[in-house]
Amino acid sequence: MNKKLLLAAGLALMSAAASAQEVKFYNTGRKWNSSFDALLNGNSIHRVTRKGAETVSPETNLQLQVTTIVGGAETVADFAIAEGYQAEAPTDQLAVITAPASFIKTLAARSEVLYVNKSEQLFPTMHLVRNETGVTKVTEGAGLDTPYDGTGVVVGVIDQGFEFKHPAFLNACKKWGSSATSGMLKNSAPFNDPNDNEGHATHVANIAVGRKVEGCNYYGVATGAELLPMMSNLSTSSTIAQAAAIKKYAEGEGKPWVINMSFGSNSGPHDGSSDTDQNMDKLSTKGGILVGAMGNSGAEKLHVMHKFTEDGEKAFFYIKLDDQLNTNSVVYSEVWSANEGEGLLTIRPAVLSRGKLCYPTAVQMNAAGQTFEAEVSPFNNRQYGKFSGYFKQLLTKMGLNTGEFVWEVEGKAGAECHAWLNTDLAAGAFAKTKLTLDDKVYTTPEGDGNYATGAGAASIPSSISVASYNNATSFTSLSGNSYSYASFVGEVADISNFSSRGPSLSTDPKALPTPTIAAPGGVVISAFSKKAKSFSTDATENVQKVTSGGTPFYYGVMSGTSMATPVVTGIIALWLQANPELTSDDVAAILQKTARKDSYTGRNLTWSKEWGYGKIDAYEGLKEAIRMRPDGVNQTLNSVAPVTLQKGNDAWKVLFNNDESYANVRVIAANGQVAYAQHVVAPQHGDELVVNTQTLAPGVYVFQVSTTASTVTRKMIVK
């Protein structure tokens, strides 16, 4: 066996047990994505990336996502390995294979294979947390005081930009991801993360599980959880394989798990139906939760929609590119039908030049390196059109000096379509303008930020999708200067300006709403990676420097739903420690019941496209998680960690973690007098006792809870 085969066999593959959830698939008559056609015909294409144009030849290795019949993925992966290619089977219906386009027809000919798709690129969703959510430092004498710290729970973080040696992660890991493109694990930390551009992963992982570092107050939510860091190139093929690896490892250890996904994109149907979303959904299970960032497109005009009232009606969507941020004039946009079926829409890319619409031919688009797909998706039976490329090159091939991109969509009565601009790759906006065509005036719609659920993470049907609000808008840097980000993030306590809005276009009644919940994501201080390409010791965002082992390490400010998501991930880790059998539906029910409402969310909020169910509350959610715990699970009579305390200004709440024979709760004044006493007979897990502190005189007290096995004593300050 040659080295290539040895490598493939080494990477090989785990295959998840067959899931009860079968991938929804429609036979459209095609066995592969139409974007492969040019390659299969022997032509090279140009792919849009953040680094610029990338030429792809028929022999360039691609990350392929191969959908199979139930139970067929492992067989297909083994076949690819035998042919000398790298392959994995993250689920029983998906094989991810690294191979050139020339291998696609060979794969498609196999009886197990339903469809060969391309991998999509995802992006980090980055654009004072603990107190705000009810998780705070006990030493401050306020907030949540609980024995639950995530111990026994695996927190997987799939991301880019880990500084593995940061003291925030000291003794936090037993395994590490060893490849940015697969689910391989290793027993030691990699030397560095090849995709560390901004230190994103370091910031994110510390929010979720960062350890306490001497001299630093910026530690994580679940400080006892086990971190499994998976450095990733964030292609959908990679993230699926890495999520499956986290699940396999945690379940092999007999531990519940939660995966943080602070990434996404504005590609796809935004309905949770893609092969990525459906197969990620298969991983979700009892004691296994996926958490995804909504995205940072809330302030962008990246979405438009149109409902057709008569056959033959036309709609036009005009894209105004940002000349300063999009100097290469990249267009990356999609139009999707909201209705199942073929022939409801005719989708055409066009160029508006000197008041006329010009339609590029396939020859012109190919010559300019553009990619245009127009087909019916086999995963939701909906038509779509997708255009990507460098627009100025297209103008040249069309013989035009000037022009702007326009979608032309013709529909049948009752049809509805949505269009999105992928602003991660193509800065711009859908803009309002007037078009006069054949003596008829059309007004193109101005874009909005609706229906912008991040693809590949928040869009997964069972994912807990997270919006961002602001717990802070300013900070003081290492230099001692104060800075305000209010113009960017918005007002304190309000939804962050950048936080992407829902809802999803899903028609699946079992899919969770997007967003599901909101957490602090604006101006969050967490660990920085000094190995990031963008890092500077003089950066304004640096807030604190600590020294560990003679080496300096840093903490600083980032904002985004990327930062809000690990807050929720860490809190769910606490809940999983208390109740390791929680499902995603259980977590969603807890969030729906316990989310905080205020004047910003609306006090009568049930759900909204901005907030989901409201602001996450760690304590109230923990109470519900304990109450939902089935008999016989993690219940210890007369335990040594009997209670969780929620310390408020007006009252202290005593939550019983387990069943106890009895409990005595006392508040003792400095002079030794008992100011409050309550005997509780046989409290059960999830029971709560509220001690009103407003009846106490200002001063320092001892708060004491005694049970058969232990006594918990805390200092109480009443002002």
Describe each PLM feature range.
Residues L5-A12, A18-D145, G152-V155:
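Autoinhibitory N-terminal propeptides
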Residues D650, V674-T695, A709-V712:
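Glycine-centered tight-turn motifs at strand-turn-strand junctions
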Residues A20, V654, A677, P698-K719:
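C-terminal tail/sorting-segment detector
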Residues A205-A208, L228-S235, K247-K255, Y332-A350, ...:
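Hydrolase catalytic cores
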Residues A142-T239, G254-W257, G272, T285-I289, ...:
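Subtilisin-like serine protease catalytic core
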Residues K174, S182-K186, L352-S353, T371, ...:
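Catalytic-core environment of secreted peptidases
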Residues T146-D149, Q160-T202, N206, E253, ...:
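Active-site core segment of subtilase-fold serine proteases
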Residues A53-T55, G252-S265, P269, L283, ...:
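C-terminal subdomain of the subtilisin-like protease fold in secreted/lumenal serine endopeptidases
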